Amino acid sequence: MYDRVADLSLEIESYDLEPLEHAVSPEFKRRTTVVRLRGEGHEGIGEDVTYSPEDQEGFQSEGHSVPLAGSHSLDSFSQLLDRLALWPAGPAIEQFRPYRRWAFESAALDLALRQAGAPLHEVIGLQPLPVTFVSSMRLGEPASIEPVKRWLDAFPKLRFKLDPTSTWDDALVTSLVETRAVDTLDLKGAYKGTPVDQEADPTLYARVAMAFPNVWIEDPALTEETDPVLEPHRARITWDAPIHSVSDIHGLPFPPRTLNFKPSRFGSVRALLDAYDYCGEQRIGIYGGGQNELGQGRSQIQYLASLFHPDMPNDVAPKAYNNADPAPGLPTSPLAPAPSKTGFRWGETS
């Protein structure tokens, strides 16, 4: 599929960086950076979703230090990025490295399409469809069902992706099962050195796998203790954090039935579209994931979900679902198709 966009012409005259921030909760202020590429009277937008505030501040302070101006194709621009130092000082965590690359690549895709006067779906030959979404959340420490109840009171049909922790006891699990609103459990077993790390816990894994027989089980840490617990449930095991390329899919401990794709993890448009092609050939299901985007990055992942996996439990809810408390009048699932007339954008009329 990449060959359908690789040769798009791309004229870049300048670029700007725009800082975004939002207090998700009293304890967490999210910061991102919008990349705006400009050329021929058009603008292409991408978003760096790196979680480290220091990395974001460093990026923004560098200004226009990356030499991007010139005439390119989308593919030659990607090759240029291979040679440029997008992280002069290196990221706080190595997993963040592709996030900045994706900001420039998605902005370039948007700009090239706008300069061509065409939307993404038209160029790659896919039809946007209504997007099913879930709301992703953690339940605090100690864990409580109250966040789920609060959102269900406001939106009774809302469905969830939840992050189990070792403080989930039988009573909490029973209460969550009774909601019948959980689609995915993210065990966070692939994270190291982050605030959301969850150690391999065979007791927790057994508890949730048995209690939720029909949900996806994402990113378990498979060890001598946990692998036997989850072996009967392998058809429901999915992977997110380890997936950056087709080679990562090949490297999984067993063939997956379904995967979670976060475009920013792939870094390049080519790596993402090659992975979509591979999963289509191998009949591997996909659902989309988000990175608490604050800008156009969120609507871009909604656009991709509408094209490649609209009916799956996509973790691409509108941005307001990332807040601690629900607000009235939020869009509900499924989201109606809303591609822009040109570019890699969603929810805009132009």
PLM regions with names:
Residues 1-14, 35, 106, 114, ...:
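N-terminal amphipathic alpha-helix/helix-capping segment at the start of soluble metabolic enzymes
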